[in-house]
Amino acid sequence: MKGLRKYLTPFAPDQSGAVSVLYELGGMLVICDAGGCTGNVCGFDEPRWFETRSAVFSAGLRDMDAILGRDDRLVAKLADAAEKLDVTFAAVIGTPVPAVIGTDYRALERMLSKKTDLSVLTVNTDGMELYDKGEEKAYLALFEKFSDKNEESEDMNDKDRPHIGIIGMTPQDVSDLKAADKIRKVYADQGMRAICYGMGDGLDEVRNASLAAKNVVVSPAALKAAQYLQKKFGTPYEIAYPLASELVPEVNYQGKKILIVQQQVIANAVRKEIEKRTGEQETITTATWFMQKEEILEDLNVDASDDVRLKEEDDFISLVENDGYDVIFADPCMERMIPEFKGRFIPLTHFAVSGKLRP
């Protein structure tokens, strides 16, 4: 039945994804709502809220503010807060309320810029899409607003450029708050410095994005931003997840029929890791509840028929019942959906699905 959920909780909406991208960058994040969306973001969708400080606010819209379009009140609140906080920028993030009343985000951005000394960006999310769509919009808005040509990069060749940029690092996508440190170590062991935008690295690194020798896309939501940086600065990008090897336990995968359920980049990185270990192209299907990008399949040389989009719980249940898999990689909360499965179930935690981080 369409929309029926018996096992999975509702996935995080787009405004949560936008907050996740901007959370660690030192800005003032104003969620344009009455308070409910902000409560969900801080209470459920952003695990760093309990460990790391960030200036996340609700606009506190009242009924008549929304009905009469009193943007001036939001501007006044934000300007007052900006005077009391040590922040580097302000971001206004949309929800269903401004979507319904047709808020003009460009006008709002101009009004806020005049009232404060801060750079202001807006993310036109509406609460109707999933978290990854909000991430995609936020990454693009972030690099469009703050990345600029660094004079140092003009005379550099790729070997001289100081770092690798990692785009797509959010808890929703990588499900591990230590993943950024692990990735930095992976590249440090190769004599390179990795910058994980939005997870341990701040706004200055975004401003210096032109210095990157290469960008690594670790989630589908980051692809548009990487393409933008390639167009603007000529920075090449690759699609990969550097920690894929730690997600694949030492098991005999030879000749097995395998299903991997995750976000598209990690799922296909796990596929490649398995094929690397077996030395063969195994019968592997990847599936995701979230966005799919044809460019990712083309880049990784994966047939589109082997990459499935799941929309309903029944899609996953039917896929398992009808295709006879020997091994399934998926979030542990999905195991109860397939009690008749007799093969091997390997936990592959996805915070966006279960709200749980990797142990």
Predicted features along the sequence, with ranges:
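An N-terminal assembly and electron-transfer interface module characteristic of large anaerobic redox
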Residues: 1-359
